[in-house]
Design a protein with these regions (language model features):
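Short acidic/glycine-rich loops and adjacent helix/strand connectors
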Residues: 1-153
């Protein structure tokens, strides 16, 4: 990647996975992604939000280091924007504490790099990833059904 092309960093801290991605700002090509599932203690059915938030705080710095080391072609000064899932859904009062870890981390990155921060919702991220992963740009509006552990839309 040439020096004049930028990288967008995406951050998502959902109920069970810490996720980071680096995307070519011009082409939209995925350059690197790192994910780590949150550990659930043996015998437990899940994680409390407070425990999950804490695990994200622990995992984000190392995942970011790994993301940067995945591709020596981009360096921090090539970052042109940061995007983060702020809420589970794009509706008023949609809130889960786990997303605060990602928002805090993304704010620090955006401020450190002096770049804009774009906030989105987790559910929209799933839909955008699906359309990007299909290889085809949608030519018109489409109907999508999203089924997840915590939300259906």
């Amino acid at each position: 990647m040439s020096r004049d092309r930028g990288v967008c960093i995406g951050v998502d801290t959902s109920c069970y996975t810490t996720s980071l991605a680096a995307v070519d700002a011009q082409s939209g090509a995925l350059l690197s992604q790192r994910r780590k599932i949150l550990p659930v203690p043996m015998g437990q059915c899940g994680l409390r939000q407070s425990d999950a938030l804490y695990q994200h705080v622990l995992q984000l710095p190392d995942l970011f280091r790994q993301l940067l080391s995945d591709s020596k072609e981009f360096a921090p000064y090539h970052v042109v924007c940061v995007s983060v899932s702020k809420t589970p859904r794009d509706v008023e009062d949609s809130y889960m504490p786990v997303f605060r870890a990602g928002v805090a981390f993304a704010n620090v990155m955006a401020d450190s790099f002096g770049v804009p921060l774009y906030e989105t919702c987790h559910q929209t991220g799933h839909l955008l990833a699906a359309t990007a992963g299909s290889g085809d740009e949608p030519e018109r509006d489409f109907l999508a059904i999203h089924l997840s552990g915590g939300t259906c839309e």
